[in-house]
């Protein structure tokens, strides 16, 4: 009897199988290379270090399709062990981990012993040094204008914004945007207004930027990051981006405007000599550049393509957090002309039931920013009206409401969140061009992880990858957290993990459940999600079932 051989259908099974419909089967190497690069890039956008704040990229789910790529971020909260309680240093105030707020560049400081301290050294151990004045020139000590408070200024972290201050007026004085003594009057006027003007503190505008949560110690106890945009230039990109995307195109090149707007003599006062001789010329130059900025922003001669050419460089210069660490800095756009941009964006979002005229008059009458005198109030008001009329009220309101909704929803971390959105928008265009696909980057904010099966499966799959942990230890930790964070409506959770767990020689399947779970009832509401994790011992599979109440 002849030996029975393998049938031809078995030997030719690979050739006779139907073509795969999965995109990753044909471009697996390219997809893996792309995913690794994407994950490394997203993790390096703003990594938190010992001295700086940032966001941790906990999870990054990338889904590839023939014409689309979906990227989902999961940004976890800071671990509890890193949160400091009341045990803080006596010279420093407690700062929250999400305090991304950035003020203007501080530049070079001079201490009492006539030694120059660079800005990068402010946040070190010598942060408590007594800084009394900003010196213009060694030969003109008699012309020093003291705008820094005498008591010690505790800086929260290296190369970042100052910590929480108990007095907003003193917090305003550390803003590098007003470091030139010519603008000390502007600084003192705003501080005096907030301290002494009760009517200003009752306005909706004040409540918007200084919510009650940040005013626990009184009307003048605020976070520095809550200061108005005229002092805190952290939302420049949002404003610029909105105006570049309106239908009635308000054409201007932010890069050209920024370069022509800042006077070189004002950019670094510590290295400038002969301030009295240049005072009048700088004022004229600033006045002319404000006029140039407004006229260029209200003209219809340029094309939108020309505006977009200078936008990436402007984004990097104005919104990159590392830009604040440079020694040679530039005066921000907002201290001089910021109220004009500040009003059209916030005038609709804050004063929803008021007209533009009332909002403008309240803003100008209450803030009383002296920088308006550089051009004259009438001229500025005329240009504002021209600016608004050109854009169209309908489109302006629509764009402003969208922007205000984003800001209001995340106003606890005003600068950090917008900086993250800027990076995501830039990455969206970059990936679309590199991969030639329609790349969509989405940020997912989940209040409770234990309400959906997919986040749990992803969370479990990442733990064995980083370190050798057994399934029992992972499941026991989840069981401890479930009673605290489980939402109402969830009856139980079942988790199964298959593979060489913890490097075992023989693969096995381990399961665990919490609560009531049933996979055999047809009318049971169940959420199911699988996940795979590649380890040095092979591939581990994770399956999660969540049962919901009827």
Curated annotation (Swiss-Prot):
Organism, scientific name: Oenothera berteroana
Protein name: Small ribosomal subunit protein uS3m
The gene coding this protein: RPS3
Region spans: Disordered: 112-133
Keyword check for Ribonucleoprotein: yes
Keyword match NADP: no
Xref: SUPFAM superfamilies: Prokaryotic type KH domain (KH-domain type II), Ribosomal protein S3 C-terminal domain
GO cellular component term of the entry, any: mitochondrion
GO biological process: translation
InterPro entries: KH_sf_prok-type, Ribosomal_S3_C_sf, Ribosomal_uS3_C, Ribosomal_uS3_CS, Ribosomal_uS3m_plant
UniProt keyword list: Mitochondrion, Ribonucleoprotein, Ribosomal protein
């Amino acid at each position: 009897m002849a030996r029975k051989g393998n049938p031809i259908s078995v030997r030719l099974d690979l050739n006779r199988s139907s073509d795969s419909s999965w995109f990753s089967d044909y471009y697996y190497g390219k997809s893996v290379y792309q995913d690794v690069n994407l994950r490394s890039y997203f993790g390096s956008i703003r990594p938190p270090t010992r001295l700086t704040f940032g966001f941790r990229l906990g999870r990054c789910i990338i889904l590839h399709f023939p014409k689309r790529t979906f990227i989902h971020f999961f940004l976890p909260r800071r671990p509890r062990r890193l949160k400091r309680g009341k045990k803080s240093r006596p010279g420093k105030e407690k700062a929250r981990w999400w305090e991304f707020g950035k003020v203007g560049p501080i530049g070079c400081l001079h201490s009492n012993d006539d030694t120059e301290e660079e800005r990068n050294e402010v946040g070190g151990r010598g942060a408590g040094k007594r800084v009394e004045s900003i010196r213009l020139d060694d030969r003109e000590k008699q012309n020093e204008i003291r705008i820094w408070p005498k008591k010690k200024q505790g800086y929260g972290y290296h190369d970042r914004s100052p910590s929480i201050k108990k007095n907003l007026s003193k917090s305003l004085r550390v803003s590098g945007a007003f470091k030139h003594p010519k603008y000390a009057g502007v600084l003192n006027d705003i501080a005096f207004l907030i301290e002494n003007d009760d009517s200003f503190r009752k306005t909706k505008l004040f409540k918007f930027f200084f919510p009650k949560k940040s005013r626990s110690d009184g009307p003048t106890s605020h976070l520095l990051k809550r200061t108005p945009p005229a002092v805190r230039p952290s939302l420049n990109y949002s404003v610029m981006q909105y105006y570049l995307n309106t239908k009635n195109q308000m054409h201007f090149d932010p890069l050209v405007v920024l370069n022509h707007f800042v006077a070189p003599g004002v950019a670094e006062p510590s290295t400038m000599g002969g301030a009295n001789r240049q005072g009048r010329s700088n004022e004229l130059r600033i006045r002319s550049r404000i006029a140039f900025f407004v006229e260029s922003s209200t003209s219809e001669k340029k094309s939108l393509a020309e505006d977009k050419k200078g936008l990436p460089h402007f984004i990097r210069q104005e919104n990159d957090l590392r830009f604040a660490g440079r020694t040679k800095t530039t005066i921000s756009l907002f201290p001089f002309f910021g109220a004009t941009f500040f009003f059209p964006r916030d005038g609709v979002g804050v004063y929803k039931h008021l007209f533009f005229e009332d909002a403008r008059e309240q803003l100008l009458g209450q803030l009383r920013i002296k920088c308006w005198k550089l051009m004259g109030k009438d001229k500025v008001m005329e240009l504002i009206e021209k600016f608004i009329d050109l854009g169209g009220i309908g489109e302006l309101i629509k764009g402003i409401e969208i922007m205000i909704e984003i800001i209001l929803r995340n106003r606890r971390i005003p600068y950090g969140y917008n900086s993250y959105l800027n990076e995501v928008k830039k990455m969206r265009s970059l990936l679309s061009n590199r991969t030639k696909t329609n790349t969509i980057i989405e940020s997912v904010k989940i209040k409770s992880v234990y309400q959906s099966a997919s986040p749990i499966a992803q969370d479990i799959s990442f733990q064995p990858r980083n370190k050798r942990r057994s399934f029992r230890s992972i499941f026991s930790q989840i069981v401890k957290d479930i009673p605290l964070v489980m939402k109402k409506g969830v009856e139980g959770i079942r988790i199964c993990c298959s593979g060489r767990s913890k490097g075992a020689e023989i693969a096995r399947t381990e399961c665990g459940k919490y609560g009531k779970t049933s996979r055999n009832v047809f009318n049971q509401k169940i959420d199911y999600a699988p996940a795979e994790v590649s380890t040095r011992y092979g591939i581990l599979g994770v399956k999660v079932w969540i049962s919901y109440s009827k």
